[in-house]
C-alpha cells in the first residue's frame, strides 16, 4: 500500500565497525557544519536587527525547550517518505536530528557573544576602518569562537 521501507543491511561483523564509525563521524560533521552556518547567520541577524531580535530570540527559546526526541518520529517518517526506498532518507533524518540537538544552543551562544562584546573592540574596528565583512571575520567570529566551540562540546557531552 505505502512506499517500500528501505532495506538496511547491517552486518554484525567486526570488520564493518570502522565503516559504521566513519558514517557516524560524517553524519556528525555534516550536522555540525549546517548547525554552525545556521547559528552564525541566525545569531548575527538577531544581534544586529533590533526589530527582529525579540521575535527571533523568542522563537529560538521555544525551539530550544522542545526535546529532540519529540522530533524523532515526525522527522524520520517525513524523510523516509520524501526519499522512499533509499538509505538517504534515513541518513538525512539522522543529520536533521543531530542538527536540532545542537543548533539552538550554538545560536544562543553566538548571539550572546555578539551582544556581550566590549564596546572598545567595536570602536577599534571603526578606528581601523574595517568593513562589515572584515569586522565579522577578524573580530566577531574569532571573539565568539570559544563560546560556540564550548557550547558545541557541552551539547555532545550531554547527548552521549
Task: Report residues per predicted region.
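Alpha-helical membrane-protein architecture signal
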Residues: 14, 18, 52-56, 92, ...
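Generic hydrophobic transmembrane alpha-helix motif, especially the helices
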Residues: 61-101
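Alpha-helical membrane-interface segments at transmembrane helix boundaries
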Residues: 18-30, 60-64, 145, 149
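Conserved small/polar residues in nucleotide/adenosyl-binding loops
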Residues: 151-159
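Transmembrane-helix boundary motif in ABC transporter permease subunits
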Residues: 31-61, 73
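Hydrophobic alpha-helical transmembrane segments of multi-pass integral membrane proteins
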Residues: 1, 29, 33, 37, ...
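Short cytoplasmic-facing helical segments at TM-TM junctions of multi-pass membrane proteins
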Residues: 109-148
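N-terminal, non-cleaved signal-anchor transmembrane helix
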Residues: 1-33, 88-91
Amino acid at each position: 500500500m505505502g512506499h517500500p521501507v528501505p532495506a538496511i543491511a547491517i552486518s554484525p561483523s567486526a570488520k564493518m565497525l570502522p565503516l559504521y564509525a566513519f558514517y557516524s563521524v560524517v553524519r556528525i560533521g555534516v550536522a555540525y557544519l549546517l548547525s554552525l552556518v545556521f547559528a552564525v547567520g541566525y545569531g548575527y541577524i538577531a544581534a544586529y536587527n533590533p526589530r527582529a531580535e525579540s521575535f527571533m530570540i523568542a522563537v529560538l527559546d521555544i525551539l530550544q525547550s522542545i526535546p529532540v526526541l519529540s522530533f524523532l518520529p515526525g522527522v524520520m517518517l517525513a524523510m523516509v517518505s520524501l526519499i522512499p526506498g533509499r538509505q538517504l532518507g534515513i541518513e538525512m533524518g539522522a543529520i536533521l536530528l543531530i542538527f536540532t540537538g545542537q543548533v539552538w544552543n550554538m545560536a544562543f551562544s553566538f548571539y550572546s557573544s555578539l551582544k556581550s562584546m566590549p564596546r572598545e573592540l567595536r570602536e577599534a574596528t571603526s578606528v581601523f576602518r574595517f568593513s562589515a565583512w572584515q569586522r565579522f571575520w577578524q573580530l566577531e567570529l574569532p571573539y565568539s569562537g570559544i563560546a560556540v566551540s564550548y557550547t558545541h562540546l557541552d551539547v555532545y557531552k550531554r547527548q552521549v
